[in-house]
């Protein structure tokens, strides 16, 4: 029998981003890509956040992040807020530190049911994002969808928040068929690790509206790292201030690109939905 059978989990969401939190700190179990896909077939999610025993002193857990297609990600802002909510529920600490593939993330609770995650500094160099070819200025790269003389989407900004993001600037985020263009752009050869694709509409210097096609997931109500990447990209273009609020289909996030250390801070809520246990039959079916 699969060791995950009958394990308890928490179903949560971060402004509509569907999250499953699986705490394996006390009973470590290896989670495979096939396991992640099997779990998604039972409990539909955007990201699976797996808490494993800490690898670094002073941290609460090493968090592995899976997309619902079984691929792994290094960052998920909404998922980390859900993880923070769950761990804060049994912790007397005012701040928590977690480790992911992208490094250490500090989390704190500025108000009831509001959680801030320090997502660290953005990566802006073309090799670090990464891109398949050199671009000296990642504020705007040569990439478009549609006819050469009348492209539908063009010249995105690119940023990594531990995962690659391409942000296309538009007048209306709802005027484009992101479900159609998203998978084409996600898998474009310029992105060797694929990319999250965001449409961004700047309302004023303090407000941006976005929609995101999430790598390994598809259309999503919210993507926290996309909100962070968009805020950074817009500030680099001098179109917004370093503190902005981002409107996503699922709700609102506050983003600050802190000038003192270049770190990006994301603040928003996390909602608990229910607890459950995995059905052993799900893993048996996946293994057959």
Swiss-Prot record:
Keyword terms: Amino-acid biosynthesis, Cytoplasm, Isomerase, Lysine biosynthesis
GO terms for biological process, alphabetical: lysine biosynthetic process via diaminopimelate
Cross-referenced InterPro entries: DAP_epimerase_AS, DAP_epimerase_DapF
Residues annotated to bind substrate: 17, 47, 67, 77-78, 163, 196, 214-215, 224-225
Record-level Gene Ontology MF annotations: diaminopimelate epimerase activity
EC number(s) recorded for this UniProt protein: 5.1.1.7
Transcription regulation as UniProt keyword: no
Pathway membership, UniProt: Amino-acid biosynthesis; L-lysine biosynthesis via DAP pathway; DL-2,6-diaminopimelate from LL-2,6-diaminopimelate: step 1/1
Reaction equations catalysed: (2S,6S)-2,6-diaminopimelate = meso-2,6-diaminopimelate
EC primary class: isomerase
Site feature location: Could be important to modulate the pK values of the two catalytic cysteine residues: 165, 214
Localization per record: Cytoplasm
SUPFAM superfamilies per the UniProt record, alphabetical: Diaminopimelate epimerase-like
Keyword field contains Cytoplasm: yes
Quaternary structure (record): Homodimer.
Protein role: Catalyzes the stereoinversion of LL-2,6-diaminopimelate (L,L-DAP) to meso-diaminopimelate (meso-DAP), a precursor of L-lysine and an essential component of the bacterial peptidoglycan.
Family classification: Belongs to the diaminopimelate epimerase family.
Record-given protein name: Diaminopimelate epimerase
Natural source organism: Rhodopseudomonas palustris (strain BisB18)
Organism phylogeny: Bacteria, Pseudomonadati, Pseudomonadota, Alphaproteobacteria, Hyphomicrobiales
């Amino acid at each position: 029998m699969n060791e995950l059978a009958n394990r308890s989990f928490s179903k949560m969401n971060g402004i509509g981003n569907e999250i499953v939190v699986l705490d394996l700190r006390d009973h470590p179990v290896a989670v495979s890509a096939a396991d992640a896909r099997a779990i998604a077939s039972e409990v539909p999610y955007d990201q699976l956040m797996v808490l494993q025993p800490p690898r670094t002193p002073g941290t609460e857990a090493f968090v592995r992040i899976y997309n619902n297609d079984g691929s792994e990600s290094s960052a998920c802002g909404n998922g980390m807020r859900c993880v923070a909510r769950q761990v804060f529920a049994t912790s007397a600490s005012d701040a928590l530190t977690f480790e992911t593939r992208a490094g250490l993330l500090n989390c704190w609770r500025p108000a009831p049911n509001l959680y801030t995650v320090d997502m660290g500094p953005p990566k802006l160099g073309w090799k670090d994002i990464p891109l398949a070819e050199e671009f000296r200025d990642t504020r705007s790269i040569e990439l478009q969808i549609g006819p050469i003389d009348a492209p539908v989407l063009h010249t995105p900004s690119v940023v990594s928040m531990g995962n690659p993001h391409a942000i296309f600037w538009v007048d209306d985020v709802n005027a484009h068929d992101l479900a159609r263009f998203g998978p084409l752009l996600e898998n474009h050869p310029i992105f060797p690790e694929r990319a999250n694709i965001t449409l961004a509409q700047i309302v004023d210097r303090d407000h941006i509206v976005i929609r995101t096609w999430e790598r390994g997931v598809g259309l999503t109500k919210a993507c926290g790292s996309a909100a962070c990447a968009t805020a950074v990209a817009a500030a680099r273009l001098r179109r917004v201030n370093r503190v902005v609020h981002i409107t996503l289909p699922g709700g609102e996030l506050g983003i600050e690109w802190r000038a003192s250390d270049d770190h990006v801070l994301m603040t928003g809520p996390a909602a608990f939905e229910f607890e459950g246990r995995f059905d052993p039959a799900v893993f048996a079916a996946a293994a057959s």
